[in-house]
Amino acid sequence: MKLFQYNLIRFGLIINVEVTHMEYTKESIHQIVLNQRAFFNSGATLSIKFRKEQLKKLRKAILDNQEQLIQALHEDLGRCEAEAYFCDVGDVVMEINEYLHGLSRWAKPETHFSGLACFPSIFTKVYKMPYGVSLIISPFNFPVLLSIGVLAASIAGGNTAIIKASSKSKATTAALVDIIGKTFPPEYAIVIDGGHDIADYCLEERVDKIFYTGSPNVAKHVMEMASKNLTPVALELGGETGNWCIIRKDANLKDAARKIAFFKICNAGQVCININQVAVAEEVAEQFINELKAAIIKQIGEKGYLNEEYPKLITKRAYQNIADEAEQYRDRIVFGGEGNPETCKYSPTIIYPVDINESIVNHEIFGPLLPIVVYKDNEVDSLLNTIAEREHGLALYVFTKNKKWAKRVMQTQQYGGGCINEVCLHLMVKGVPFNGVGHSGMGAYHGIWGFREFTHPSTVLFGHTKMNLPLREHPYNKKKKNLLSKFLK
């Protein structure tokens, strides 16, 4: 048994927390929440100086242990070193840096003129207040970025944090338990391992903010549990009908194919903003398919599942689900369709043509299968109407030379974020939100948006003790009524 003691000299408070390496129970989870609430109520997390110190500790911990994390990501997901750093470790360091650079400015109280109606008050402040104890439930597909990146937002907001990491990404979760355990006392931040039962123990607790990343079905359960305590929730989901990519007949097909191939190879398609299906104009469909095949072959070879750099699916069950779905479309597989169940690697697979109403384009695939839907270019509005009628995706991508049309689509469709003539890079832009809508989520984070997600505004009017406003007091007369009507215009 390991005993942590955190001595808060400034507040005269000592908190003793016992943490064992045994499996968590309902009682031990409850005790962690109580200890974190006591720590938060001590006021220790409120100062900007403290928050920045913790963010720097977090950054140092990630950088000092990046080899351990990269190795764990390879073990869990088969990632090569470059992809592990680019998609997880490096990304999270960038995220922490953004919080460090902007926190003082974002956290500064806003000052507003109170207005004549509030005379003699002159000014009103809006304070950005932390929620308290935050619960972060992270997925397996980007187990560092989607846990530590959210933790950074929670820290920046002035909260404590409990991270329920995925039980599927075993090696990375074990590494995070070790790294965060060495970096922070558990009454401030802790990573918890375990299955659905442990997640439910966490959700049963009265925490102050929940941030969940995962599937819409589980998100409904999270919201149901959160509703019992009216706990505010942020959800980052993939969307039930996935993310569309639309290719017009005037698109640069070679460029589009190269980018789509890269993205579908990334993490073997296990990406919440990945392209779930492509809709390509029939006038250029065959040419696009040929370009896409060539792009995949150039990047990982004709048999991608044999390439050491190509990632694997997270579990044998995930592999089997992908293999089974591909088998249903065996007669329309024009590329790929092969894998190795022992390594859990399944090649990028093009399925063509697919009707827009078939099941494979009506759910999130979360793997390396890519169904291709064909439409007539002059009937693109019909395609857009069909997409709009379905559950909103986390991302939308369009490839075209017609920028005016592309902008119109991006301003009229419902989706989380997206790109014109590009894929996924909107995720990397500083200062912009990452979010979903409808079945792809609610709330937003990254940079200032993450700070906002983990804080709530509190408005405080500063009154005057030597002056008052008799106009608002009884008894009322015609003169007061006339003056009030002028003040309140």
Tell me the role of every PLM-derived stretch:
Residues 23, 46-50, 246, 346-489:
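Conserved C-terminal structural/oligomerization subdomain of aldehyde/semialdehyde dehydrogenase
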Residues 51, 96, 158, 189, ...:
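Residue-level signal for inorganic ion chemistry
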Residues 13-124:
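N-terminal Rossmann-like NAD(P)+-binding subdomain of aldehyde/semialdehyde dehydrogenases
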Residues 5-6:
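Low-complexity, intrinsically disordered or signal/transmembrane-proximal segments
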Residues 115-255:
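Rossmann-like NAD(P) dinucleotide-binding subdomain of oxidoreductase/dehydrogenase enzymes
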Residues 23, 184, 217-356, 378-381, ...:
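ALDH superfamily catalytic-core signature
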Residues 40, 44, 59-62, 66, ...:
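Structural signal for hydrophobic packing residues in well-ordered secondary-structure cores
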